Each structure stands twice: as structure tokens, then as C-alpha cells.
Amino acid sequence: MLIDGHGRKVDYLRISLTERCNFRCQYCMPEKPFSWVPKENLLNFEDLFKFVKAAIDEGITKIRLTGGEPTLRADLDKFIKMIYDYKPDIDLAMTTNGYLLKDIAQDLKKAGLKRLNISLDSLKPEVAAKIASKDVLKNVLEGIDAALEAGLKVKINMVPLKGVNEDEIVDVMEYCKDRGMQIRFIEYMENVHAHSDLVGMHGKEILDKIKQKYEIEKIGRQGSSPAFLYKLKEDGYIFGLIDPHKHDFCETCNRIRLTAEGYLIPCLYFDEAMSIKEAVQAGDIDRAVEILKTVLANKPKENRWSEDANEASNRAFYETGG
């Protein structure tokens, strides 16, 4: 069992397979030009899998593949199958923008992927294009349909932004409700790489938009999930709100992050990290596990997105998967 320095059980590993992305979302990507990490600097799937096996043996029960955009990584389905074959009952999920899903959803399901979180910030082509800096909506909607047809469990993530997509909060929720998908509204997380003119909506503002049409009931958090759940009184539809600015957001954090270059990151907000790359490539898995435990021992108690401070993180979310 893996325990962090504050006594929290850690059983959830998030793996960023690449920092590259085929979108340039305003709340994630920098305005100024930047260079990707060379592909040869990334851990290959064989070395990644060595660490994944060790992490599972130490108590990891849930793995989420992220990016950047994970579907850009070649042989993604083969890596998923490697994990599934080693531990068929592992909770294996992926976060994606959905743009490439139409042609690969069936393969991912067959390989052993169980769940998907797909970003959908607007149902208006022009607004989706503004946010992603690319005409994306048609492909994303087709990807969602393909994932559902493949039998994957799908949740939708939406980041409400003032003056951009705040008028679509209910529309996107109803789109999800009609298709049996849970939507999770994610508060915009301030970071130095996002466009400087963005203003996110706080949880209360998001709920107020929904209350203009629906009566809602609080459910609460389930397990270690960061989402606070609510229910529509009308039909029992459940949606989530991820609010990192709340003081209790970090109390049940059970996750550790691994970047595509092999850095273990204890918290999305903080820059501190340790690399397992050399240890894994040398076949010294015991050393990699030691590094994992050291990082967990230094895991902070909470982030700094407090309701009062609203500090901006230096961490690039396209490196760590958000």
C-alpha cells in the first residue's frame, strides 16, 4: 500500500503519454510559441510498463492515461493491452479531447480501456473553434458517439469561461443527459501558460446558471473523487462540479502523476518532481519504487488555488494532463 506524508492512501496513477496536442485550448496552452520535448526524450512504452507493473504491485488500482492528447501516441492500444493483460481488473481510463476517437474507439475498448473522459466546452462550432483554436466540434461529437457505440463509459468535462461559453452550461449538460453521460463542470485553474484574458466561473456561478432552469440537490463527494455531485430533482440526473479553489478539495487526494519524460509529480499545482527515467531504463525497478515513495512522502497537503489566494500555477497542464 502506498501512503503519502499526510496519511492519505494513494492508489491512482495518472500517466501523461505526451505533452503534444492537436488543440491549442486557451485555458491550457501558452499564447507565445514553445517547443515540444523531443520524442526521443520520452519513456517508451516498454519502460513505462516496467514502472506501471511495479506501481500496481505496490497498490495502484486505477490508471488514467492523459496528455497532452494521448491519442497522438502511436501504438496506444498496444500499451493499453499490456496493462490490461497484466491486471485485467485494473480501473483503466483515459482523458482525451475526442478528436481522433472516431476511428480508434473500438480498438481501445478491445485492448482493455474501460472509461473515457472527453472534453466538450461548447456545442457551437464557432465557440469550440475559438477555445481550441481549431475547427473541432464535428470530430469531437463523432468521437463521443463512437466511444458510446464501442461500449466505453463516458464522462464529459466542460470548463465554463465568462463571456465565452457560460451561456451553454445547461445546453451541454442536457446534451450529456440525453445520452446517458455524466458531465463534470471544471473550474478554470489559473496557470501561467493560459491566455491572460481568461476569466473562469466559480462553482457557485455555475450552479446558479443551472438553477435558472432546474432545482438541484447536493449529493456530495464519492470516495476520493474530486467531483462534488449534484442531482436534478426533476429526473435524478447526476452531474459533478470540480472546484479546486475550495479548502477541502485536497483532503482525499489519492493520486500521483507521471510525465511522458518520466518525472513523478506529487501535485498538479507544484513544480517539484523526481525522475524515474534513469532507474527504469537501467532496469533498477527497486530504485524507481524508492523514488515513488520519496515523492509521495513529500506530497503537499493541499494546492494553492485557495478561494482567497487564486495563485497561478507554473505547471503546464499539457505536460501533466490536468
From Swiss-Prot:
Enzyme class: lyase
Annotated residues for binding of [4Fe-4S] cluster 2: C250, C253, C267
NCBIfam families assigned: moaA (TIGR02666)
Any GO BP: Mo-molybdopterin cofactor biosynthetic process
MF (Gene Ontology): 4 iron, 4 sulfur cluster binding; cyclic pyranopterin monophosphate synthase activity; GTP 3',8'-cyclase activity; GTP binding; metal ion binding; S-adenosyl-L-methionine binding
Radical SAM core domain boundaries: 5-227
Subunit structure: Monomer and homodimer.
Name this protein carries in UniProt: GTP 3',8-cyclase
Catalysed reaction equations from the record: GTP + AH2 + S-adenosyl-L-methionine = (8S)-3',8-cyclo-7,8-dihydroguanosine 5'-triphosphate + 5'-deoxyadenosine + L-methionine + A + H(+)
